[in-house]
Amino acid sequence: MNEEQQCLLLSSASRFWPPKGVKLSYGTAGFRADASLLQSTVYRVGILAALRSLKTRSVIGLMITASHNKVSDNGVKIADPSGGMLSQHWEPFADALANAPSPQHLLLLINEFVEKEGISVDGDWQVEVLLGETRDQVEMLCFKQLNRASLQLLELLRQIWES
């Protein structure tokens, strides 16, 4: 990854700092918390979904939902190509991404995981992520901004891995 690409990723990530004093963990329901705590997590799960799409060469689902709970209680989770839950093998990486204390640490985690998992970054697969939501808290989660940032991030990841 060249310096310009690293700067773009770091700049994008610096818009979504993780909440202080909160440690999130990926489980059956994905990441669950009050909507006010999930902005950085949703952004980082977008990265996770993009990497999962590259690894599986399939469409990945990303959902914001907790329809059976009070409105402020939200979750963000990934659906694998089969429609099932995210592979348990990827959950520790999901936890690490969500809890990375800085954009620099986030970048390091991404680079290490791509290498460890042998994720093909040769540019012959276009990332495909479907986003669904069922909650009124989408505005609180900054989806308009996040969607723009995620699209920029996906494009950045594509450029990085094609070079």
Model regions and ranges:
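Gly/Ser-rich phosphate-binding catalytic loop and adjacent alpha/beta segment
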Residues: 1-163
